UniProtKB/Swiss-Prot annotation:
Organism name: Archaeoglobus fulgidus (strain ATCC 49558 / DSM 4304 / JCM 9628 / NBRC 100126 / VC-16)
Function: May play an essential role in dissimilatory sulfite reduction.
SUPFAM superfamilies in UniProt: Winged helix' DNA-binding domain (SSF46785)
Family stated for the protein in its record: To D.vulgaris DsvD.
Gene that specifies this protein: dsrD
Designated name of the protein: Protein DsrD
Domain of life of the source: Archaea
Pfam families: DsrD
């Protein structure tokens, strides 16, 4: 059972589609509890909508589409 609203989920999803985020940063700009944001992100990952992306030293989260764009740019150099 989720302890967040569909509106909360949509806010997180909207931000994840714009750029990569570390969960604490995402929680801060959304003014939401970090645990709630982490739960929403995990649910989005489980649904196949979001995913993790690593810069090599740091792990971020974003939508699958945004991650695909980043990987394409990375491959192109």
């Amino acid at each position: 059972m989720a302890d967040y609203t569909e509106e909360d989920k949509q806010k997180v999803l909207a931000q994840l589609s714009k750029k990569t985020w570390k969960i604490p940063e995402l929680a801060k700009i959304l003014k939401m509890d970090k645990k709630v944001v982490k739960k929403i992100v995990q649910d989005l990952i489980n649904e196949g909508v979001a995913g993790y992306w690593s810069s090599g030293s740091t792990t971020y989260v974003a939508t699958k589409e945004y991650i695909e764009e980043l990987e394409k740019k990375r491959a192109e150099g």
